[in-house]
């Protein structure tokens, strides 16, 4: 990750593997990313603030807060749109609450700006 970010900031291309949000695994296919002359890179991810390197090089960091009921509804709609069964969605939601959500909530501490999302 650190090497790829440095490469982008130096104006060079990187190749990254695609991520399958349904299986939570990396695909064999890749994408090419190029930032060009820009000195801005936006890293969007639920655990981005958990990475010390990212925090150290970032001028701006944001944490998006949302009511848990709204987050659950959005989560379930997201996976329903992918034609995943309700049983699978509920299981995935439970698993994420155990292995991912605690890390995400703890990362709020590192954000320079907290944004309350109410939709």
Regions found by a protein language model. Name each.
Residues 51, 80-119:
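Small-molecule kinase domains that catalyze NTP-dependent phosphoryl transfer to phosphate-bearing small molecules
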Residues 20, 47, 119:
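A broadly conserved detector of short glycine/acidic/proline-rich loop/turn motifs that flank catalytic sites
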């Amino acid at each position: 990750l650190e090497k790829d970010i440095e490469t982008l900031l130096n104006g060079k291309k990187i190749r990254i593997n695609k991520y399958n949000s349904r299986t939570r695994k990396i695909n064999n296919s890749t994408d090419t990313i190029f930032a060009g002359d820009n000195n801005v890179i936006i890293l969007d991810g639920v655990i981005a603030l958990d990475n010390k390197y990212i925090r150290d090089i970032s001028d701006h960091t944001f944490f998006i807060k949302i009511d848990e009921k709204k987050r659950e509804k959005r989560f379930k709609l997201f996976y329903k749109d992918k034609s995943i069964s309700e049983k699978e969605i509920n299981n995935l939601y439970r698993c994420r609450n155990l292995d991912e959500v605690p890390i995400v909530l703890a990362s709020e501490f590192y954000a320079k700006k907290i944004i309350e999302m109410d939709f």
